[in-house]
Amino acid sequence: MAKVYYEKDVTVNVLKEKKVAIIGYGSQGHAHAQNLRDNGFDVVVGLRKGKSWDKAKEDGFSVYTVAEAAKKADVVMILLPDELQPEVYEAEIAPNLQAGNSLVFAHGFNVHFDQVKPPVNVDVFLVAPKGPGHLVRRTFVEGGAVPALFAVYQDATGVATEKALSYADGIGATRAGVLETTFKEETETDLFGEQAVLCGGVTALVKAGFETLVDAGYQPELAYFECLHELKLIVDLMYEGGLENMRYSVSDTAQWGDFVSGPRVVTEDTKKAMDTVLAEIQDGTFARGWIAEHKAGRPNFHATNEKENEHEIEVVGRKLREMMPFVQPRVKAGVK
């Protein structure tokens, strides 16, 4: 079982006298920066010119270029998309790191897969809240917190663990609990969850269910409701209390169908396929493929995205959601 740390375990905050640079001011960046500042940390924000720069200035932060922020800081937290981090790190962060500095991440992908290679004289750790930035900020303001993971990759100073816990405490995570892990474990489990269950697995299951009903002659609108729209109701129940809560809350007919039909859909062959997915994450096959795809301009990514967006379930869903303004997305989907 994971070791969990709480506020009582952070007896001395070793970062309170240090300057922290938050690189990026998106979902996680704004939450980390504001929570740390509210807890008395000296925070600057490092960005390239754009809307985020203006937003960070409006929120009262001193904003610098990434290179300037990294040079000023003792602690550099990189909160940029995975695929952008290596270039920004090499060009703007690495040249400005000093011995004893801390290089911090919220996801271990680039360090674990050798896309970012820190110098041996800096501490390297991650602090990863298990929730989106708006929730990290909102719960903090309300006096609560989102749990987080932390891991130490490199301890150059002998106090990297203390620094990681101090950072986690600064964003409020120790109120809920901070679980100790490794860069390897955090990276591989995160990627597996996305691919086999949360994104890849769920979308494939939803489409397969929809197609099965439509191919059998049922109206696509009903197939959409039964296989996609109502998924939120079930996921919310699981989110609140696990599978047990979901099964308690649905009808007995639905629960019996769960017991007798679920294992026939997700079979031992499915688990074997999951094993293959995990193996490709572990041996770097997935990472190499994604890095190559990004460097090539993402031709397959964009082509697949365009094709998926025109699947019948999407066409039907757009029409049905016009009947339900209460489910309109907060952010309009578009080209990444």
Curated annotation (Swiss-Prot):
Enzyme class, first EC level, given as a word: oxidoreductase
Residues annotated as domain KARI C-terminal knotted: 182-327
GO CC annotation, single: cytosol
Coiled-coil intervals, chain numbering: none
Any single GO BP term: isoleucine biosynthetic process
Residues reported in the UniProt entry to bind NADP(+): Y25, G26, S27, Q28, R48, S52, D82, E83, L84, Q85, G133
Recorded metabolic or biological pathway in which this protein acts: Amino-acid biosynthesis; L-isoleucine biosynthesis; L-isoleucine from 2-oxobutanoate: step 2/4; Amino-acid biosynthesis; L-valine biosynthesis; L-valine from pyruvate: step 2/4
Residues reported in the UniProt entry to bind Mg(2+) 2: D190, E226, E230
Domain KARI N-terminal Rossmann: 2-181
Presence of the UniProt keyword Ion transport in the record: no
Protein's UniProt keywords contain Cytoplasm: no
Catalytic activity reported: (2R)-2,3-dihydroxy-3-methylbutanoate + NADP(+) = (2S)-2-acetolactate + NADPH + H(+); (2R,3R)-2,3-dihydroxy-3-methylpentanoate + NADP(+) = (S)-2-ethyl-2-hydroxy-3-oxobutanoate + NADPH + H(+)
E.C. number(s) listed in UniProt: 1.1.1.86
InterPro entries on file: 6-PGluconate_DH-like_C_sf, KARI, KARI_C, KARI_N, KARI_prok, NAD(P)-bd_dom_sf
Cofactor needs: Mg(2+)
Binding site for substrate: S251
Catalytic site: H107
Pfam families for this protein: KARI_C, KARI_N
Details of cofactor binding: Binds 2 magnesium ions per subunit.
Protein family per UniProt: Belongs to the ketol-acid reductoisomerase family.
Annotated function: Involved in the biosynthesis of branched-chain amino acids (BCAA). Catalyzes an alkyl-migration followed by a ketol-acid reduction of (S)-2-acetolactate (S2AL) to yield (R)-2,3-dihydroxy-isovalerate. In the isomerase reaction, S2AL is rearranged via a Mg-dependent methyl migration to produce 3-hydroxy-3-methyl-2-ketobutyrate (HMKB). In the reductase reaction, this 2-ketoacid undergoes a metal-dependent reduction by NADPH to yield (R)-2,3-dihydroxy-isovalerate.
Protein name: Ketol-acid reductoisomerase (NADP(+)) 1
Organism: Bacillus thuringiensis subsp. konkukian (strain 97-27)
